[in-house]
């Protein structure tokens, strides 16, 4: 699902390579459907991470809740149709629409939440996390905190894969 994009120089990902190449990097999520169950993986970038059409690093960007709502609409769904939300990790471009799904069962890794509460200095410098996420998640009604791998009742398997972040 397309939740918007940021337009950035490739060099921020691969210093010294492809100087001058500009990339459109999408904010994405996934919709998993099993019969009548609708599972959303990640919820896009926070509205407040895009200011005057710019996001992380001051690069042009578009996204936010209206993009999440529009992506669902293209699938014939609304926010109320989502039963479950799974977060791969808690970076600001993956958790922005959390409040759209306050009633949904919400799965995330314990280590990821702990890292959100206490980010490493480099994570603070890069602004990986949006501190508003803590307040947003306080309003979610059905937390399913995962500590490692887990198989959901519908057979979907969640695996803890640290690397990009401590848990995802």
Residue ranges with predicted function:
Residues 27-29, 147-149, 168:
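Short, acidic/polar N-cap/turn motifs at the starts of alpha helices
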Residues 40-43, 83-89, 108-109, 160-163:
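Active-site neighborhood of phospho(di)ester-bond hydrolases with catalytic His/Asp-centered motifs
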Residues 48, 90-95, 165-168:
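Active-site environment of divalent metal-dependent phosphoester hydrolases
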